[in-house]
Design a protein with these regions (language model features):
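DUTPase catalytic domain/fold
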Residues: 1-153
Length: 153
């Protein structure tokens, strides 16, 4: 269900699979959400570059992150994610959505740095644990939204 892992033996945990940091972007404009997706407008972002030895220092705020791994959710599975406890203990959290049956892509999440002193992250840091849940039966409909195949083309 997960491809392109940095180190599958390390990332495979008792209850799921850890996803690692590929890219960080900062928000540059406002987004818009309405009842249907016809008026959805995603905000502009700008990629932040990792510095010496692949480290980056982030100030408090919200960031869009992209993971290294490509996730493939079967028709009879859904997934939820939780931040790693080390991330929380450093004063940062991740906001995520549900991984629907049929979704395939290199997912993104919202990183929120709450620590007034910021946080330092290294490229490929393990940030999140994806937990897979088997459904009682295969989903009648599978994910077919705009994020299908995201960041892998």
């Amino acid at each position: 269900m997960v491809e392109s892992a940095v180190d599958p033996q390390v990332q495979t945990q008792m209850c799921g699979m850890e996803l690692t940091l590929q890219k960080i972007e900062e928000f540059r404009s406002q987004g818009a959400i309405a009842y249907d997706n016809s008026e959805r407008k995603l905000p502009a972002t700008q990629e932040l570059k990792f510095g010496e030895a692949d480290w980056i220092d982030l100030q408090p705020g919200s960031y869009l992150i992209t993971f290294n791994e490509v996730v493939n959710i079967p028709r009879d599975v859904a997934a939820l994610a939780r931040p790693r406890s080390s991330l929380l203990r450093c004063g940062a959290s991740l906001e995520t959505a549900l991984w629907d049956p049929g979704y395939r892509g290199r997912s993104q999440s919202l990183l929120v740095v709450h620590n007034p002193s910021g946080i330092r992250l290294k490229k490929n840091a393990r940030l999140l644990q994806l937990v897979f849940m088997r459904l009682d039966h295969q989903a009648e409909k599978v994910y077919s939204g705009i994020y299908q195949e995201e960041n892998i083309r």
